[in-house]
Curated annotation (Swiss-Prot):
The keyword Nucleus applies. Its main location: nucleus. The gene is MAD2. Belongs to the MAD2 family. Pfam families: HORMA. Disruption phenotype: Quickly loses viability when treated with nocodazole, which causes disassembly of mitotic spindles. Exhibits increased frequency of chromosome loss and greatly reduced virulence in mice. Keywords: Cell cycle, Cell division, Mitosis, Nucleus, Virulence. Component of the mitotic checkpoint complex (MCC). This is Spindle assembly checkpoint component MAD2. One of its GO terms (biological process) is biological process involved in interaction with host. Gene3D superfamilies: HORMA domain. One of its GO terms (cellular component) is nuclear periphery.
Length: 214
C-alpha cells in the first residue's frame, strides 16, 4: 500500500499513476471521436505525446470525464484497479457494440525498487521512452477505424465506463455495473484485436478492443 512506501517511492508511484491516467483519458477521448459518439465540432485539438490529440470540449462531457479520471487516478495510486472498460452501446436496443479493455498491472515493489531511480518522473524508464510506446498505441487506436464496423447512421450510440477493482474496495454506487455492461462480448460474430502495451517502472498497461461485425 502507498502508506508503507518510502517518500521517493510514493513520488514514483504518483508520477506513474498520472501517466497511466492521462493515457486512459486521451484514449477515451480518441475513441469517442473516432467512433463518432459525439459530433466532431465538440472536440478540440491539443498536443500530447508529440501528437495532435483530440479532447471533448463540451462542458458536461468534460466534467463527466474529469470526475471519472479523478477517481481512477486514486484507484491506480492505491493499486486497487485492474481493468478500465469502455463499452459503446446502441441507444435503440441497448446492445453492447464494442468493448475497449485496458488492463493495468502493478509490478512487484521489490522489483520496482531495484530497477527504478525513484525520482517520481516515470522512474528508471525515461519519459521519452514511455511516450514513444504510448504514441504507437494511440496510432493503433486511430487506425482501428479502418477495420471496425461502421456504426449505423440510423442509430444513436452512447458509452459506459466501468472498472474492475479489488474486491475489498469501496466503490461509489454510480460505478456499480447494474446492467451487466462489463461482460465480454460473445457470439460467432465477435472479433478481438490486441494492441501493443506500454509500461513504466511501476505499471504495465495493455489495450484491446472487441467488436461485433455483420
Amino acid at each position: 500500500m502507498p502508506s508503507s512506501l518510502e517518500p521517493s517511492s510514493k513520488l514514483a508511484l504518483k508520477g506513474s499513476s498520472k501517466i497511466v491516467c492521462d493515457y486512459f483519458e486521451f484514449a477515451l477521448n480518441s475513441i469517442l471521436y473516432q467512433r463518432g459518439i459525439y459530433p466532431q465540432e465538440d472536440f478540440v485539438t491539443v498536443k500530447k505525446y508529440d501528437l495532435p490529440m483530440v479532447i471533448n470540449d463540451d462542458y458536461d462531457v468534460q466534467k463527466y470525464i474529469n470526475n471519472i479520471m479523478k477517481q481512477i487516478k486514486k484507484w491506480i495510486y492505491g493499486s486497487l484497479m485492474s481493468k478500465f472498460i469502455i463499452v459503446i452501446v446502441s441507444k435503440t436496443n441497448l446492445e453492447n457494440i464494442e468493448r475497449w479493455e485496458f488492463n493495468i498491472e502493478t509490478k512487484d515493489q521489490e522489483e520496482t525498487t531495484e530497477n527504478g531511480d525513484g525520482d517520481g518522473d516515470g522512474v528508471g524508464k525515461s519519459r521519452q521512452e514511455i511516450q514513444k510506446e504510448i504514441r504507437t498505441i494511440i496510432r493503433q487506436i486511430t487506425s482501428s477505424v479502418s477495420y471496425l464496423p461502421v456504426l449505423k447512421d440510423d442509430d444513436e450510440y452512447t458509452f459506459n465506463v466501468l472498472v474492475y477493482t479489488d474486491p475489498n474496495t469501496s466503490v461509489p454506487i454510480e460505478w456499480c455495473d447494474t446492467q451487466g455492461d462489463g461482460k465480454v462480448l460473445d457470439g460467432d460474430n465477435v472479433d478481438n484485436v490486441k494492441f501493443t502495451s506500454f509500461s513504466t517502472d511501476i505499471h504495465q498497461v495493455g489495450t484491446s478492443v472487441s467488436y461485433k461485425y455483420e
